Design a protein with these regions (language model features):
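Glycine-rich, Arg-bearing micro-motifs that act as flexible, cationic patches
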Residues: 139-145
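Short, structured coil segments at secondary-structure junctions
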Residues: 40, 128-130
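RNA substrate-binding interface of SAM-dependent RNA methyltransferases
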Residues: 2-94, 160
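Conserved small/polar residues in nucleotide/adenosyl-binding loops
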Residues: 168-175
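Active-site helix-initiating loop/hinge in glycosyltransferases
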Residues: 29, 145-147
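Short glycine-rich anion-binding loops that position phosphate/pyrophosphate groups of nucleotides
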Residues: 95-98, 116-119
Length: 175
């Protein structure tokens, strides 16, 4: 449980993270992720062809009336986005990695990148950046993957936890 002071710090720090969705297909997932990002002051980048219209009623329902309070942007060109983003610290979330998301070190300004619900992140991107790949471990091998919104929530809160702990540790040593 966070104190009010920790929550305030978390909100300030989390603005420096970006959640990226490559070609999301399911409106309610994107709406829920947008709401999650908005609640934490995290930017949301939607990249490539979307499997829905931004006016979709299910997208709006999942995001409720918060869309005006969410820092989000749509980048139509996947290649251009990758050229710019991959100059930063980024994490590719995929089922095709053996490294757990908890083994990664998250810092301010990081990008948490997730693929579409149906195809994930393209193999060409994964092969070009194997050191940036990580996964959410699952015990049951019969389950191929988790829901995209659930996955974003799990990884986002781990990144926020690490950033907050790091920031709190630095502040403690300043006094």
């Amino acid at each position: 449980m966070y104190t009010q002071n920790q929550l305030s710090t978390l909100r300030k720090l989390s603005r420096l993270l970006t959640v990226t969705l490559f070609e999301p297909q399911i409106p309610p997932n994107t709406g829920n992720i947008a709401r999650l990002c908005g609640a934490n002051g995290v930017k949301l980048d939607l990249v490539g062809n979307l499997g829905f219209d931004m006016e979709d009623k299910y997208l709006k329902r999942a995001g409720l009336d918060y869309w005006n309070h969410i820092d989000w942007e749509h980048f139509p060109n996947l290649d251009n986005y990758c050229k710019t983003t991959f100059k930063n610290n980024f994490h590719l979330l995929t089922t095709k990695s053996n490294k757990s998301y908890t083994e990664r070190v998250y810092r301010k300004n990081d990008f948490l990148i997730f693929g579409s619900e149906t195809a994930g992140i393209s193999d060409s991107i994964l092969h070009a950046h194997p050191d940036n790949m990580c996964t959410i471990p699952m015990k049951n091998e019969n389950i191929r993957s988790l829901n995209l919104a659930t996955s974003v929530g799990i990884v986002l809160y781990e990144a926020l936890r690490q950033i907050t702990v790091s920031y709190t540790h630095l502040r403690a040593h300043e006094t």
